[in-house]
Amino acid sequence: MIALIQRATRASVTVEDEVTGEIGPGLLVLLGVEKEDDEQKANRLCERVLGYRIFSDADGKMNLNVQQAGGSVLVVSQFTLAADTERGMRPSFSGGAAPDRAQALYEYFVERCRQQAINTQTGRFAADMQVELVNDGPVTFWLQV
């Protein structure tokens, strides 16, 4: 399971001209689900995403996680993160989880975030989405479990 996390001043996701999720300061989480992923990996990745200390403390040092910083989370499914780009000029998506399994784990991940009392917004699984982001920093990290 892969999360590309970006520290955001604000972010939103729109599906068919409807804003489905919007946050102020916090994290935009692009989430990719791989074939071998399960709930245990989702739990571990959620723990890492929410605990990752990439927000500045009073001394300007990256020392706070999203909850300590008072931020929110916007989770957007992105199967392309599971692509194999090693060869050729076209990515292979054979490493990605089957759609039903990927959706179940995506929804599980989102629910785990919400259980941590963090405002968690979402896109719409498997939809064609427009994602807007003001990346603060820019600060972007690739987390994989």
From Swiss-Prot:
A motif (Gly-cisPro motif, important for rejection of L-amino acids) lies at residues 137-138. One of its GO terms (cellular component) is cytoplasm. It comes from the Bacteria. Keywords: Cytoplasm, Hydrolase, RNA-binding, tRNA-binding. One of its GO terms (molecular function) is tRNA binding. An aminoacyl-tRNA editing enzyme that deacylates mischarged D-aminoacyl-tRNAs. Also deacylates mischarged glycyl-tRNA(Ala), protecting cells against glycine mischarging by AlaRS. Acts via tRNA-based rather than protein-based catalysis; rejects L-amino acids rather than detecting D-amino acids in the active site. By recycling D-aminoacyl-tRNA to D-amino acids and free tRNA molecules, this enzyme counteracts the toxicity associated with the formation of D-aminoacyl-tRNA entities in vivo and helps enforce protein L-homochirality. PANTHER family: D-AMINOACYL-TRNA DEACYLASE 1, D-TYROSYL-TRNA TYR DEACYLASE. This is D-aminoacyl-tRNA deacylase. It comes from Salmonella paratyphi A (strain AKU_12601).
